[in-house]
Amino acid sequence: MDTKDIQKAHGHWILAKMGKRVLRPGGKELTKKLIDSLAFNASDDVVEFAPGMGFTASLTLAHKLHSYVGIDADEDIVRMLSKKLQSAQASFNLGNASQTNLKSASKDKVYGEAMLTMHADHRKSEIIREAHRILKKGGWYAIHELGLTNVD
């Protein structure tokens, strides 16, 4: 979450520093719809890619789950969320969405919001492949992303 050097800081962190709290397409309404559509239950093992400030993680953890893992590449975020959202079934891991180091076929539901949009096409493919790898057979991968359409 380093925003000291504006030339090197990620745009979403600069906006957050300026007070912008909802940095997702469709706002909180679409986030809630995504979470509702996942229909969490007490046996679910869930992974969130790039939980950021933890809004969606807090909605997810309001459900009874078997386990929740948030994977974020920012050490400050992992530390902050580990303190802010303490739960027996939750953990926040420092890592990369394209290489989580989680066991194959071990998760029921994986989701991420507005994070694929920020990556190059080859990285998007790697992240989607990783979601597929860690999902159990019949598991769900839910995303909330920008869609761009050429009007020409």
Please provide the spans of the model-predicted regions:
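A short acidic, Gly/Pro-enriched loop at the edge of an enzyme's catalytic core
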Residues: 98-110
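Conserved class I S-adenosyl-L-methionine
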Residues: 43-52, 142-152
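Class I SAM-dependent methyltransferase SAM/SAH-binding core
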Residues: 52-99
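Class I SAM-dependent methyltransferase Rossmann-like catalytic core
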Residues: 9-28
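A short SAM/SAH-binding and catalytic strip from SAM-dependent methyltransferases
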Residues: 109-123
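Conserved alpha-helix/loop element of class I SAM-dependent methyltransferases that forms part
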Residues: 24-42
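A short glycine-rich, Lys/Arg-flanked "PGG" loop and its adjoining helix->strand segment in the class I
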Residues: 125-140
